[in-house]
Amino acid sequence: MVQKLEKFQMALGVIFLSIFFIAILVQIVTRYIGVSVIWTEEVANYSFIWAIFMGAAVMVNRREHFSFDFLTQKLKGKKRASLLTVIDAIVAIFAFFITLYGYEAVTTFWNYNWLSLPELKMGYIWIAIPVMGVTMLIYSLNHIVSHIKVLLNKEAV
């Protein structure tokens, strides 16, 4: 399930990164030919936000965020699993608060409108925060379960 979630989230990130790229391209071309298209900047900014947040959550699952891993590289077995459990618990707590406060941001800004496209609500942008938080929490809890299996000798290191 976690791998399917990651693939979906990665695909979503790629879609938003593609929208970002296309919006920037449209902006460059229209400026070159002297036509003013005002919505491209907002579309580029907001699609980039979604792409970054989806990618950040995937990086939690893949453990690709910047970290000081000297100690985790030196430890083996149950000691390493214990340390990784603590680290993932901290990430899970952080993800919980991102979800909680992200939800508050969504409810606060839901009815605000985009400047260039007033038909669209800002809530669609802000919802990326709790989506990222929930998926980070799922990934962290999945890691914790794996570490607990190692600690209980149910899985090899």
Positions of predicted regions on the chain:
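Alpha-helical transmembrane segments and membrane-interface helix-loop junctions
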Residues: 1-157
